[in-house]
Regions:
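Boundary-proximal intrinsically disordered activation/regulatory segments immediately upstream
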Residues: 1-49, 131-132
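A general structural signal for well-ordered alpha-helical segments in protein cores
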Residues: 8-11, 34, 58, 67-70, ...
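Short secondary-structure boundary/capping segments
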Residues: 17-18, 61-64, 88
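Structural motif
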Residues: 24-25, 45-46, 69-72, 96-99, ...
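A residue-level signal for conserved active-site and pocket-lining positions in enzyme catalytic cores
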Residues: 30, 72, 140
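RNA substrate-binding interface of SAM-dependent RNA methyltransferases
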Residues: 39, 93-145
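Glycine/small-residue-rich loop that forms an oxyanion/phosphate-binding "nest" at active or ligand-binding sites
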Residues: 52-78
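Intrinsic disorder/low-complexity segments
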Residues: 82-97
């Protein structure tokens, strides 16, 4: 399997928020993360493996300094509204554990917070608009732990 120059450009562009938003896609890197994405409710659009596309191509599409053996392009879920108060207001008055975040700018910190929130069974996480994008490659990577 080969990868075209256009595919490389598209996957590489997903390291920037504006392209993730425009295309409705994000990347997941690493064997474990790709396997988890494939078992999850997320729609995996395409999986790239180093043994199939080659090390050079993998290093071109990876956002990591040391590319992992696999990378998946995943569709952002449509049922998560990251820019509206509607999700927050629908949760008010309901019981459960909720976490509110204010201005988390470091992607690694946000990923760690999300991983720990999941472990503790937090039902929903709300973040201020100026919080780093949850689909930032470093946030996604940090959720793995």
């Amino acid at each position: 399997m080969s990868i075209s120059a256009n595919e490389i450009k598209k996957v590489r562009s997903l390291s920037e928020k504006k392209f993730r938003d425009r295309l409705g896609l994000f990347c997941v890197e690493g064997e474990k993360m790709v396997e988890e994405a494939m078992r999850s409710r997320f729609d995996v659009e395409k999986v790239y493996r180093k043994e199939e596309i080659g090390e050079e191509a993998m290093s071109k599409i990876s956002a990591l300094s040391s590319p992992s053996p696999s990378l998946a392009v995943v569709r952002k879920p449509k049922d998560i509204n990251l820019s509206s108060d509607s999700d927050l207001s629908s949760c008010l008055g309901k019981s459960g554990l909720f976490l509110a975040l204010d201005t988390i700018r470091d992607p690694g910190n946000l990923g760690t917070i999300l991983r720990i929130a999941d472990w503790f069974g937090i039902d929903a996480v709300f973040a201020a608009p100026d919080t780093v994008d949850v689909f930032n490659p470093k946030v996604v990577q940090a959720t793995m732990g």
